[in-house]
Amino acid sequence: IEAMAHHIVPARDVLYLGRGTDYPLALEGALKLKEISYIHAEGYAAGEMKHGPIALIDELVPVICIAPSGPLFEKTVSNMQEVQARGGKVVLISAYDGVQAAGEGCLATITMPKVHPLIAPMVYAVPVQLLAYHVAVLKGTDVDQPRNLAKSVTVE
């Protein structure tokens, strides 16, 4: 994951795609990257990619695809292919069979254990957070005290 972070460091923008129960993890991954590395990142539902985010795709915008094996995997692969057809660079986070099926042509892959789709977001959160951490460290930001963040929210 640390070696993969080198590919993300120069980016000004990063997109995270997730489908189904992995969509909130795409949002969380983008939030973590923004908070500690100060790179603009957005999380999107993979099925909504054609409704806006696809216009942002080029060779300078890495796309992190969170795609566990399961019934929605092939649909996410279709999104990955659309990104690659536009010159986008894909980082695939998937189980071994997913990486074998769709990893060719990706900028990088992270191979995860095969788990039930309902617990995949908990398992896949680890590499998503580690990627944000390593990008921030490589950029030289203080990951323990991100700028302008409060530890709590005050309600008035």
UniProtKB/Swiss-Prot annotation:
Gene3D superfamilies: Glucose-6-phosphate isomerase like protein, domain 1. This is Glutamine--fructose-6-phosphate aminotransferase [isomerizing]. Catalyzes the first step in hexosamine metabolism, converting fructose-6P into glucosamine-6P using glutamine as a nitrogen source. The lineage of its organism: Bacteria, Pseudomonadati, Pseudomonadota, Alphaproteobacteria, Sphingomonadales. The keyword Protein transport does not apply. It is found in: Cytoplasm. Homodimer. GO terms for biological process: fructose 6-phosphate metabolic process; protein N-linked glycosylation; UDP-N-acetylglucosamine metabolic process. The active site is at residue 151. PANTHER family: GLUCOSAMINE--FRUCTOSE-6-PHOSPHATE AMINOTRANSFERASE, ISOMERIZING, GLUTAMINE--FRUCTOSE-6-PHOSPHATE TRANSAMINASE (ISOMERIZING). GO terms for cellular component: cytosol. Residues 4-146 form the SIS domain. One of its GO terms (molecular function) is carbohydrate derivative binding. Keywords: Aminotransferase, Cytoplasm, Glutamine amidotransferase, Transferase. It holds the Pfam family SIS.
